[in-house]
Amino acid sequence: PIRRIWEDGIFQVGSQFSHTWKFSDINYQVASLEDKKVMFLDYSELLNSLDAGSIAKITVNNRTLNRANFEQSVLMPMRGDARDKYRKEYNGVILGKATAGNGIVQEKYLTVTVPKKNIEEARAYFTRVGAGLAVHFAALGSKCVELDATERLRILHDFYRQGEEVDFHFDARDMMRKGHDFRDYICPDYIERHSDYLILGGKYCRTLYLKDYANYIRDSFVCELTGLNRNMMLSIDIIPIPMDEAVREVENRLLGVETNITNWQRRQNANNNFSAVIPYDMEQQRKESKEFLDDLTTRDQRMMQGVLTMVLCAGSKEQLDADTDQILSLSRQKMCQMAVLKYQQTDGLNTVLPIGTRKINAFRTLTTESLAVFMPFKVQEIQDKGGIYFGENAISHNLILCNRENLLNQSSFILGVPGSGKSFSAKELIAFLILNTEDDILICDPEGEFAPMVQAMGSDIGTVVHVAAGGRDRLNAMYMVEGYGENNPIVVKSQFIMSLVERIDPKGVGAKQKSIIDRCTGDLYEEAEQNSTVPTLAALREKLMEQPEAEARE
C-alpha cells in the first residue's frame, strides 16, 4: 500500500500521508493506584489532542532480541591480557540471564495518517503534530522521537524477515542510483495466502481482531495480550470524531430512543393500559444515551471510533494454532471476544503494520476514557548500550543494563537491609569497571573485604594499601599533585603542615615557631625541586633540627 517514501520518514499511502513516532515505555503496571490515575488522565489528554481530521494508530511491537546486536552492545570485548578469563565468565553470566528471560523486546509506535494535497503541507502538519505529541508524552514521563525512512523500513524488514535482522541495509541515494524499489529491501521471499493465516517467507502469521467488547475492561488488557513470549504486533486504530458531529449524532440517537418510548406509550394508552412501565431495554437505551451525551458536553470527553487488531507469528502451523488458542482464551477470560479474520488476512496485516493504512472496519464507538483503557504502557526497560548489569526487571524479566555515563548525575548509593547483597553489588560494579573501562578506582575498605578482588585482578593495575598503626604503608603529608593549591601551592601546604603540628602538640604553636615551619617548608620544597625528590615529614624534621633557633628543636 506504500506508494512513495521520503527520507524524513513520511510515507504516501494511497492519497494520504503518514508519519510514525516511537515512544518509550513507562512504569505503569508497577505504579501505585494514585500514580496510575494521574497517568490515565495524562494519556486521556493525549488522546483528546489527536486531530479530528487525521487517523492515529498506536502499535505495540514484540520482536525477538537479536543475539548478534545484543552481544555487540552488551558483552565485554576481550583485550588479550590475564583478565580475559574474568571477562569470559562475566559474558557467560550475562548470556545465561538473557536466555533465561523472555528474550522479547517491546517497542511502541504512534502513526498519524492525514489527507493532504502535497508533501509540503503534510510535512508542515507533521511538524506541528510532533511538537504537541512530545509535550504530552513528556507529561507521561515518556520520550517521543520521530522515525526517518530507514527506521520505519527497518520495522517492516524485521517483521517480514524474522531472523535476518542483521542483513538490513537501506541507502536511499544508492537505491535511486541503481533504480531499485524500496520494497525489494523489506518484502519476504514469498507470500502464501490461506483463509485464516499467511506464510511470509517460511514464517506463519495470523491476524485477529477484537470482535466483542466487555462492559468493563481492565487497563492491563493490552499488556496481557502482548505478554505472550512470541513475535507479535498489536495495533489500535483511532478515528477522532469532530465534537459538533459527535454531539449531533448522540442527540439524534437520544431523540430516536425518546420517539420509540413515546410511540410505545401511545400504543399502551390506546389499549387503555395507562400504568404500563417502560420496557427495560428502552430505559437502558435512554440512560446510556444521556450518559454518553453528558460525557461529551460536560466531562470533556470525545467520541472516537476504534478497532483493535493483532498479528501472531510462529515457526510452524501447530505453534501458531496453539498461540491463537491462548490469545482467544485470554480474551474470553476478560469477557471479550477476539476473532480470526477469514479471507481478510492480508487486509488485517496491512491494518496492523505501522504504515498508516486501515482495511478492517470492525469499529466500536468509544469515549476518550473507554479508549484510554487500552493502555499501551507496561514497564520501563533499561538496556543502555555498554551498560552495567544491575539485575532483572521484575515484570518483563529482561536484563537491566544501565550506562551511568548517560545520566546527568552519575553518583549513586547502594542501600539495603543487612544481608541483601550491598557488598556483592559493589564488588560486581567495581569488577565491571576494572575489566571494561580505563577508570581510576579508589576503594576505602575499613573491613578489608575488597583486597582479595583487587589482588585477583593483577598487580599491574591494582595496589592494596594498608593504612594502620604499625603498618608498612605510610601516607606522605608533604606530597603535592599537579595543580595543588592553585596560585601558591607551597603556602597552602605550609598552612596544612602547621595545622597538622598544632593537632599533634596540645600546647599549640607560637608565632615564631610558625615562621620557622613556614621557612623550612619553603626551603625543603626548593631543594626537592632541584634534586627531583619528594619531601617527607622526616625530611622536614631534619630540616628543623638544622635550624639555629632553639624553638625549631622543641
Predicted feature locations:
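Non-catalytic, charge-rich alpha-helical accessory subdomains
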Residues: 281, 285-293, 301-302, 318-322, ...
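Glycine-rich phosphate-binding loop of nucleotide-binding enzymes
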Residues: 11, 19, 26, 33-35, ...
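Switch/coupling segment of Walker-type NTPase motor domains
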Residues: 27, 34, 59-73, 84, ...
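A glycine-rich phosphate-binding loop feature that marks nucleotide/adenosyl-phosphate handling sites
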Residues: 62-63, 149-155, 342-352, 451-453, ...
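Conserved structured core elements
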Residues: 37, 104, 127, 304, ...
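Pre-P-loop entry segment of helicase/translocase ATPase cores
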Residues: 365-394
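Hydrophobic alpha-helical scaffolding
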Residues: 119, 123, 279-282, 313, ...
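Extended, folded cores of ATP/NTP-driven motor/assembly subunits in large transport
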Residues: 1-376
